[in-house]
């Protein structure tokens, strides 16, 4: 576990590759969906207290997002009781089905735990970013989801032109763009298949132009590994008769408006009556 001196140890990383010829390392964010290169002499090993504090802050942010979600759901069920005159226990719920493609198996595992705690219907697949455009069509046919997530790692590559528009200055955005385009050939309707695409510092505008409903990263900032989960939860639990409140949706993420954004989109939640006793 390391941090970068030049960035004030703002993010902690794992070293995933070392190039002894160039004295550089490839780093993966512990909590952020970022892949970065760094000089070996810029790396610092944090002490145990720093690591503990970093992990605690991240865990608290995650727990707060989950608490907000459950408070919102509780309020929505009470509203249902007052409108229908029936107890929420008489209904059954069918949130939208999610297909989550992730370029990192560790992040995927953490996301699946979060989905489970939020009682979401999800299929998770580890698919490297380069392979997502190749595999997305087959996986969509196989699983028939209501919501698709395309994520993993990404990074903006600094350049002399300070060019934020060319996809060549992003590590993986072009693969996410291609995958979104393939998914839109499978299902063109943005309300029929809801798509979130991107990771840290991804090309937000290009992803939306390709057909994503939601994407990262408007301000080219880092996003948390669980941000896609918290974002699509709101879509999965918003009625098919309503548009998702974008401000409410983004409020439930860890990163907020700087990291994720998107378009007005209809929800994927269906309510059923009566609930079977069996």
Language-model segments: residues:
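Intrinsically disordered, low-complexity, charged/polar segments
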Residues: 32-80
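Proline-aspartate-enriched helix->loop->beta-strand connector
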Residues: 140-153, 212
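Conserved acidic segment of CheY-like receiver
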Residues: 96-105
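Short beta-strand-centered aromatic/proline hotspots
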Residues: 9-19
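C-terminal functional extensions of proteins
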Residues: 219-278
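SH3/SH3-like beta-barrel fold
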Residues: 15, 24-34, 38
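Catalytic cores of nucleophile-dependent amide-cleaving enzymes
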Residues: 176-223
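Short helix-loop-beta junction
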Residues: 112-123
């Amino acid at each position: 576990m390391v941090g970068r001196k030049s960035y004030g140890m703002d993010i902690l990383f794992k070293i995933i590759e070392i190039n002894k010829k160039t004295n550089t390392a490839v780093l993966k964010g512990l909590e952020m969906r970022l892949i970065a290169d760094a000089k070996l002499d810029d790396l610092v090993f944090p002490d145990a207290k720093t690591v503990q504090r970093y992990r605690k802050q991240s865990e608290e942010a995650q727990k707060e997002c989950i608490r907000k979600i459950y408070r919102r759901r509780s309020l929505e069920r009470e509203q249902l009781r007052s409108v229908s005159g029936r107890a929420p226990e008489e209904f059954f719920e069918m949130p939208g089905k999610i297909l989550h493609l992730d370029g990192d198996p560790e992040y995927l595992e953490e996301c699946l735990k979060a989905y489970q705690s939020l009682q979401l219907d999800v299929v998770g697949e580890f698919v490297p970013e380069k392979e997502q455009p190749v595999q997305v069509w087959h996986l969509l046919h196989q699983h028939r989801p209501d919501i698709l997530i395309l994520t993993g790692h990404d990074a903006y590559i600094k350049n002399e032109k300070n060019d934020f528009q060319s996809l060549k200055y992003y590590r993986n955005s072009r693969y996410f763009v291609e995958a979104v385009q393939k998914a839109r050939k499978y299902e063109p309707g943005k309300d029929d298949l809801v798509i979130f695409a991107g990771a840290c510092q991804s090309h937000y505008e290009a992803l939306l132009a390709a057909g994503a409903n939601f994407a990262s990263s408007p301000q080219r900032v880092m996003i948390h590994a669980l941000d896609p989960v918290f974002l699509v939860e709101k879509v999965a639990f918003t009625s098919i008769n309503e548009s998702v409140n974008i401000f409410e949706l983004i409020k439930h993420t860890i990163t907020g408006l700087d990291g994720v954004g998107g378009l007005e989109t209809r929800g994927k939640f269906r309510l059923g009556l009566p609930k079977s006793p069996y």
